[in-house]
């Protein structure tokens, strides 16, 4: 008996296969009282994005959303008038159906970031406030030779 080997050239089944695709209906920036700034994302269904921060000279908060089928037009850049948030940029990758949202925040500040999902409304909220309990770290001085 012989064995026949065939190449499987089709795409493997994605772990997201069979799930209803994500539609992003709206994204809104809100400046609240007491130094809170909020970024709201309105979905068509429950979705828990991956969120992480990048420190450095240009600190940012990054939100990754998978299985996105469409985004309402005009949402590639969201206007902000924040004290903590400088700008919000978005990019949709049609090949992977992933969306990345980058929130650029002011440097030399300590932040507190909370995230909440309101299931009844399908709204994911990122709440950013300045952490006044601990001062921003001073940059270390260069050593003298």
What is each residue range found by the language model?
Residues 1-145:
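Short linear recognition/processing motifs and adjacent strand/loop elements at protein termini
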